[in-house]
Swiss-Prot record:
Subunit-level organization: Homotetramer; dimer of dimers.
Catalytic activity: L-methionine + ATP + H2O = S-adenosyl-L-methionine + phosphate + diphosphate
Known role: Catalyzes the formation of S-adenosylmethionine (AdoMet) from methionine and ATP. The overall synthetic reaction is composed of two sequential steps, AdoMet formation and the subsequent tripolyphosphate hydrolysis which occurs prior to release of AdoMet from the enzyme.
Positions contributing to ATP binding: H14, D165, A166, K167, R232, F233, D241, R247, K248, A264, K268
Location in the cell: Cytoplasm
Binding annotation for K(+): E42
Assigned protein family: Belongs to the AdoMet synthase family.
Protein name: S-adenosylmethionine synthase
Record region (Flexible loop): 98-108
Binding site for L-methionine: E55, Q98, D241, K272
GO molecular function, one term: ATP binding
Named cofactor requirement(s): Mg(2+); K(+)
Amino acid sequence: MAKYFTSESVSAGHPDKIADQIADAILDAVLEQDPKARSAVEVTTSTGDVSIFGELSTNAYVNIRKIATDTIREIGYNHAELGFTADSVNVSNKIVEQSGDIAQAVDNAEDDPDQLGAGDQGMVFGYATNETDSYLPLTLALSHRLMRKIRDARENEILPYLRPDAKGEVTVELDDNDKVKRIAAVVLSTQHDDEVTLEQLRADIRKHVIDEVLPQDLVDEDTIYYINPSGRFVLGGPQADSGLTGRKIIVDTYGGAAHHGGGAFSGKDATKVDRSAAYYARYVAKNMVAAGVADKLELQVSYAIGVARPVSLNVDSFGTAKVSEEKINEIITKLFDFRPLAIINNLNLRRPIYKQTAAFGHFGRTDIDLPWESLDKVKEIKNLL
């Protein structure tokens, strides 16, 4: 029986991703003035409306409405026919200050007063695979590339009739060793102007987007292409569907190839281990795989609120390790510090670097420079093997 695996991605103009980008744009603006600000901003989007709420503790002053409308405009919602535009949207701001109880627990770790405690309990996962140069599953890497390509086709007016909302999905067939054998199917749905015919859109998307992204040695005559399979897709974005921060956590991470602890990223400052520890776990997994420790590796790290040191750390190499599990744990324990303040300092996370991550994935990015994607520990790991 054939074995398949699928991942998806969405465009920057997807309603949930609009919300994520606004939340991280607010975070970045605050961090520019106040690197130690605490943020847990949430955003909803709907027809003609953006609601911003959550918690923010900072000495900075930022223009929330302007940040939201500038972000919407940058994404491409700037024409009245889209039903959701930067110039007409209503922005409501209901942000409040962070709970004092949470603040004191974070500022004074129970197990180490000189360290920050975790901002909440919970578990995070980090993952890497040598399946691609980006150390992401091929299905997710290709899905993200499809979404970036369709954005470029719209912004560069190669396909000027495209609108900002889009989704993509790639399915591969695997061999008996779980290696990619071929691309079995591609699904791509994109919003478009009313005038374009479905026939033209499908031909253009195949030529200018899909065929320019997919590795031709992995497609064959049996590869299936579903381009706008629902047909008409004129109404899209928040005019058609409401959006909310944190609803694309699998798109943001590993495309379903690894576990997820449930915590979202956007709008959260680095004291929130949902974000910072997940980034650090990716950093560890990527460096370990790049050093040849295993073909793929997943870390689970768990925390207690107000406590600096992790409650637990578990490693799974899926049977691909080149050394013993004991050796892997020994290397990780020796080289990597999972306490929140150590993570913040090691990755320099008190900077306005987050908005750029809020679309097209937080990991495996080759178009932007992210500290948790650095391979600066590979040499040290190899020296310990």
